[in-house]
Amino acid sequence: MRGPAVPLTKMEHYLVLTEDIEATKEFYCRALGMHVGFRPPLEFPGYWLYVGDTPCIHIAEWQTYTAHSQRRGIPVSTRAPGTGPFDHIAFNAENFDEVLARLESHGVRPGHNAVTGTSLRQLFLTDPNGVKIEINVRT
């Protein structure tokens, strides 16, 4: 049984906790073409990475973010490698060959999938922290 819907309007962002915020930032900016954008003055190191005008990935240094959260009574994720309790995050793109070439030019060798009976082609890769990323292209 389903109750009343929560009035959600969109997915906003996901947070990657890492020991190396610089390497993580470089991966998303170089391999996926995101850019660093505005981030308010928070009490822990990190970046907000944008696709266009949307800040979709937040990156924070693991230890300082965890300490910050604990001080405020915010639940802290367990330190599981990779994606922890979720499997992956997905993005849409427009040109499969262009995306593949860009990834490969940065040393990323993604897995490929074509969804039978559809025009959907997919790429699967991981960031430097083991977070699995899916890129969907409809041809």
Please state what every model-predicted region is.
Residues Q63-S77:
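Short, flexible, mixed-charge acidic loops at enzyme active sites
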